[in-house]
Amino acid sequence: MQSMQPSTVDKLKMGAIMGSAAGLGIGFLFGGVAVLRYGPGPRGFLRTLGQYMLTSAATFGFFMSIGSVIRNEDIPLIQQSGSHWNQRLLNENANSSRIFALAMQQAKSSPRKSNEVAEC
C-alpha cells in the first residue's frame, strides 16, 4: 500500500514554517549584534530587534517555501527524464571518443613538418 504524499500546498506551508523558524533565529543573532554594535536607535531595543527578526523570517520563509515546492515537485517525472538525459550523455561521450580516436589515428598516419602551419 502506498502512503499519501503531501500536496503542493502542504509542501509550501512546511517550507514557509521551516524558513520562518530559521529566519527568526538568524534575525535574533544578527539583530542582536547590530543593536549591541550600533545602538537601538529611536525605536528602542525591542522594536529594532523585532524588525530584524520579522524581516529575516519573512525573507527566509518566502524563499524556503518556493524552494521546497520546486525541489519536491514531480520527482518520478524528473527521474524518467533524467534517464533519457543520462543515455543521451553516454551516447555523446561515446561519439566524441570515436571522433577523438579517428583524429589521433590520422595525426599519427600523416605527421606534419615542424614548420608547417596547421589549418583549421
From Swiss-Prot:
InterPro entries: Romo1/Mgr2
Transmembrane segments: 16-36, 50-70
Biological-process GO terms, alphabetical: protein import into mitochondrial matrix; protein insertion into mitochondrial inner membrane
Extracellular side: 37-49
Membrane protein topology class: Multi-pass membrane protein
KW Secreted (keyword) present: no
SMART domains, per database record: Romo1
A cellular component annotation (GO) from this entry: TIM23 mitochondrial import inner membrane translocase complex
Segments in the Cytoplasmic topological domain: 1-15, 71-120
Disulfide bonds: none
Localisation: Membrane
Pfam entry (one): Romo1
Major subcellular site: membrane
Family matches, as PANTHER family: REACTIVE OXYGEN SPECIES MODULATOR 1
Family the entry assigns: Belongs to the MGR2 family.
Function: Required for cell viability in cells lacking mitochondrial DNA.
Listed name of the protein: Protein mgr2
Organism: Schizosaccharomyces pombe (strain 972 / ATCC 24843) (Fission yeast)
Gene name, Swiss-Prot/TrEMBL: mgr2
